[in-house]
Amino acid sequence: LEKEPTADDFGRPANKWTYKNTDIGTYVDYSLMVAEYTNGVSGKEVYNKVGKTAMDKYDVAAYVDGNDASKAILPNVAKDNKDDLTGTDTGVLTQVFVNDDEKEAVVTEINTYLGIADSDYSAKKDEADFTVYGLKKSGKVHVMDKADDGKSYVSFKVSGEDFDVSKVEEDDAYLFTVAAGEVQPFVPAETIKGTEITSFKKGSNVTVGGTKYDFSKAAYYDNEALKVYTGENNNDTINLKDTTYNVYLDTYG
């Protein structure tokens, strides 16, 4: 059994294991992780976790969904920055790694996207088709797209060779992560089906059954559909009674 230091598709430090030239798998080296967040976190907080020595002398990098984002993020990792670090927000998994032996540090941000199955699993093709929302294709990679034009989605064919999709049924909801131009591990979404929404604030929160849920950064909703019920300027707190909706929850509460 052999171990080779590497990085996973999200840019996190990892170890690749092989046995007699056969790949066993690549696994994140969590022993190097010094902090983890699922909400907005200040540039000062991340700076303190990385440490002054590492920020000044180590090779430091930053990635969003596996895409190099060092130029956008690292200037904001500063001891006097009390604002949320670029890209960090509700529902974004931000992880900070420091490797003192190799003098390296990495900040990674992983978004979670809603995907809906387009059809039942095809046993003949051994695959399932999904539409994943809040994304767009940019060259060979995918990036978050928050445009309200109804076109913020990407279609994926997921093979049974890569993931167990044998139980996927049409309209099933899943929580997707995406990196390196490909689907990464995904899980079924917790769904509140056929519920009334008592209030909705665009880009902020939704209230269902007396419970207020904050929107994930990658939350997606059909802006044109909202206009049917709320008018052209649907950016205030509004009432959506007399209509039922499906509300999808991520794993971060």
Please describe what each predicted stretch is.
Residues 1-253:
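...the same signal can extend to comparable exposed beta-sheet modules
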